[in-house]
Regions:
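Two-component/phosphorelay signaling modules centered on CheY-like receiver
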Residues: 12-30, 96
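The feature encodes the CheY-like receiver
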Residues: 15, 58, 86
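Acidic, metal-coordinating helix/loop segments flanking the phosphotransfer/catalytic sites
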Residues: 31-50
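Acidic catalytic/metal-coordinating carboxylates
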Residues: 33-34, 61-64
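Short amphipathic alpha-helix used as the core "switch/output" element in two-component signaling
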Residues: 63-74
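Alpha4 helix (beta4-alpha4-beta5 surface) of REC/receiver domains from two-component response regulators
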Residues: 64, 85-100
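C-terminal output helix
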Residues: 88, 106-115
Length: 128
């Protein structure tokens, strides 16, 4: 079964790069540039196995989106990315049970390894 990943970030270059790497690893990918767009995907059917989410988004933080997802009993795993780490964000991410926390910039192989550790291999990999 092909695992699904939603990438949420307003930096289009990052979205394209991460999408490409995860597609190559065999994951089904969707992308959103804001929390509002992400919600349209997240509450759809079937659910995503994983959400890779930037904390700094237009109008709303990634932490705020995670809070709503957890309140709505969304079971997707979450990797929170941030270039602006603060003790408050890190603490809130832990409280909301964010599965992984990545500081930007990060090595793409680290991201792929984290994705695999959380939801397993992609399946249907073009890489073989």
């Amino acid at each position: 079964m092909q695992r699904s990943v939603l990438i949420v970030d307003d930096e289009q270059l990052l979205v394209r790069t991460v999408s490409s790497v995860l597609k190559e690893a065999g994951y089904r990918i969707a992308a959103a540039g804001s929390a509002e767009q992400a919600e349209k995907y997240v509450f759809g059917d079937p659910p995503f196995d994983l959400i890779v989410l930037d904390n700094r988004l237009p109008k709303e933080s990634g932490i705020e989106l995670v809070r709503r997802l957890r309140e709505s009993a969304v079971k997707s795993k979450v990797i929170l990315m941030t270039a602006y780490e603060t003790p408050e964000v890190k603490s809130e991410a832990k409280r909301l049970k964010v599965d992984r926390y990545l500081r930007k910039p990060f090595d793409l192989t680290v991201l792929v390894d984290e994705v695999k550790s959380l939801i397993g291999p992609g399946g249907n990999s073009a890489a073989g």
